[in-house]
Amino acid sequence: MASSGLSSRRSIMASRLTASAEAVNEPRRGAVVSRRVEYDEESLAGAGGESRYEVFINHRGVDTKRTVARLLYDRLAQAGLRGFLDNMSMRPGDRLEERIGSAIRECTVAVAIFSPSYCDSEYCLRELAMLVESRKAIIPIFYDIKPSDLLLPQAVADSEVYLPRDLERFKFALREAKHTVGITYDSATGDMAELVSAAADAVMYNMEKMETVQRRETMILSRL
């Protein structure tokens, strides 16, 4: 019965994603994302109050916030999935680390958008380390970089700002991401609509897989 419900939900999500595909084509020429449609976080959460975030979007804002990160957030919202994107999901007065940490713990799937300046960002690295340590399903998008480019910059490694254990956490998280099958995108030749569609499909696939595993674990525990 649970399997039937999950399949039904995936079918609904897929139909919504298909119906919204044309919206992604609009910004293909440039970096500015259409703001005609805004999503109210509270309406996505439902009348009963805030629900948990299902998808965490880890990204370097200066590289991808106004393109793939925002487009993917919109696409998931149209499919009825509640994604966490910092500038869309946080409100004045929120404590940054608490809000982000809570969203990471709640999510089922994360999308990590690796871009040229990603590894220069402390926030990106800390979020990635938390996602890996929380054993979340992570979908890498290699945006204008190759997996082999995921290395801790020497400036970060030599900095006295970070504790040795933090540097090890960052290195481990980057290694894990490097060896995870992801989506590669070249902004000079790629199709943004295809990228967002592939990322949304990957989110649905991984959510179904994680929910199946959780359901099996619950069944096993109930028999003990």
From Swiss-Prot:
Site feature location: Important for ADPR cyclization: 123
Single GO MF descriptor: NADP+ nucleosidase activity
Enzyme class: hydrolase
InterPro entries documented for this protein: TIR_dom, Toll_tir_struct_dom_sf
Binding site for NAD(+): 60-65, 93
Domain TIR: 51-178
UniProt keyword Repressor present: no
Coiled coil (UniProt feature): none
The keyword NAD is assigned to this record: yes
Keywords: Hydrolase, NAD, Plant defense
Catalytic activity, reaction form: NAD(+) + H2O = ADP-D-ribose + nicotinamide + H(+); NADP(+) + H2O = ADP-D-ribose 2'-phosphate + nicotinamide + H(+); NAD(+) = 2'cADPR + nicotinamide + H(+)
Pfam families assigned to the protein according to its UniProt record, in alphabetical order: TIR_2 (PF13676)
Active site (catalytic residues): 127
EC number: 3.2.2.-, 3.2.2.6
Any single GO BP term: defense response
Quaternary structure annotation from Swiss-Prot or TrEMBL: Homodimer.
Role played: An NAD(+) hydrolase (NADase). Upon activation catalyzes cleavage of NAD(+) into ADP-D-ribose (ADPR) and nicotinamide; NAD(+) cleavage triggers a defense system that promotes cell death. In addition to ADPR, also generates a cyclization variant of cyclic ADPR termed v-cADPR (2'cADPR). Also hydrolyzes NADP(+), but not other NAD(+)-related molecules. v-cADPR activates ThsA, an NAD(+) hydrolase in B.cereus (AC J8G6Z1). Probably makes 2'cADPR; the cADPR made by this protein is bound by cmTad1 (AC P0DW61) and activates ThsA from B.cereus.
Domain comment (free text): The TIR domain catalyzes the NAD(+) cleavage (NADase) activity. In contrast to classical TIR-NB-LRR receptor-like proteins, only contains a TIR domain.
Protein name: Probable 2' cyclic ADP-D-ribose synthase BdTIR
Provenance organism: Brachypodium distachyon (Purple false brome)
Native organism taxonomy: Eukaryota, Viridiplantae, Streptophyta, Embryophyta, Tracheophyta
